[in-house]
Amino acid sequence: MNAAGVRMVVTRARSRGTGASLRRRGEKAAPLRSGEAAAEERKSYSPVKRRRKAQRLSVAYEASEGEGGEGAEHLQAPSWQPQDWRQQLDNIRTMRSGKDAPVDQLGAEHCFDPSASPKVRRYQVLLSLMLSSQTKDQVTAGAMQRLRARGLTVDSILQTDDSTLGALIYPVGFWRSKVKYIKQTSAILQQRYDGDIPASVAELVALPGVGPKMAHLAMAVAWGTVSGIAVDTHVHRIANRLRWTKKATKSPEETRRALEEWLPRELWSEINGLLVGFGQQTCLPIRPRCQACLNRALCPAARGL
């Protein structure tokens, strides 16, 4: 392009001002033209086409410097949220203010030996979560006490025969299967992680006997990282009763995905313990205590909706 052509493009671009560029912020850059198309454009050059192309390149640069980074989806307002959910959540917080449910005293945060090394504490957290599936907190806590009395480490578990391990964890739910899973997982941790537990959900759920709920809780309790919402049967049941999912869900994992679509991320770490205790004390699986619930006028299930 000669000097006169450059002056013409600059003059017309300035006459448009910066408003068009600001209004177009967030537009995607036009795909690069093929060599044949670019040659054709040079043959039929016009200042208007050149000006539009320059604007698109400018917008693409601005977008690359903007908010499109990792985690940006959590900054956007969700397209759907349940009706009255904030009031319902505040009411549950009020009902749970005493922190006197079984999960508050016997959950995974309370089952490890605080005097053990960080690596051993993380292992004990994972084992308590593996034992907790389909098991009341009181039973899980009792099994953990018996295991800890013998020195609960990866090595000690691998040196314990299956019958002895079964007697120590009985009567947790599916205790025979859990003996097998605990042994297999402990061997993997010894071989691949130097006796520690993985620090990612993907690696945790790859371990025998470890599901998504356990993995997210292990990340929170053992590693102090919020990786997702831990959904068990209590959270699954309450979320559906309150209509906290856009449509009815059939499994805890489906409920987790539905909740994470709209629940603000800063609430993810709180929601499990809050709803589990609420489910243990008030929103029971059978004959829920709706008359004692502050949400009875806001709960679709309580109103028969």
UniProtKB/Swiss-Prot annotation:
[4Fe-4S] cluster binds at C283, C290, C293, C299. It comes from the Eukaryota. SMART domains: ENDO3c (SM00478), FES (SM00525). Transmembrane segments: none annotated. It catalyses: 2'-deoxyribonucleotide-(2'-deoxyribose 5'-phosphate)-2'-deoxyribonucleotide-DNA = a 3'-end 2'-deoxyribonucleotide-(2,3-dehydro-2,3-deoxyribose 5'-phosphate)-DNA + a 5'-end 5'-phospho-2'-deoxyribonucleoside-DNA + H(+). Residues 1-28 form a transit peptide. Residues 192-216 form the HhH domain. Its EC number is 3.2.2.-, 4.2.99.18. It is found in: Nucleus; Mitochondrion. GO terms for biological process: base-excision repair, AP site formation; nucleotide-excision repair. GO terms for cellular component: mitochondrion; nucleus. InterPro entries: DNA_glycosylase, Endonuclease-III-like_CS2, Endonuclease3_FeS-loop_motif, Endouclease-III_FeS-bd_BS, HhH-GPD_domain, HhH_base_excis_C, HhH_motif, NTH1. Binds 1 [4Fe-4S] cluster. The cluster does not appear to play a role in catalysis, but is probably involved in the proper positioning of the enzyme along the DNA strand. The keyword DNA damage applies. This is Endonuclease III-like protein 1. It comes from Bos taurus. The gene is NTHL1.
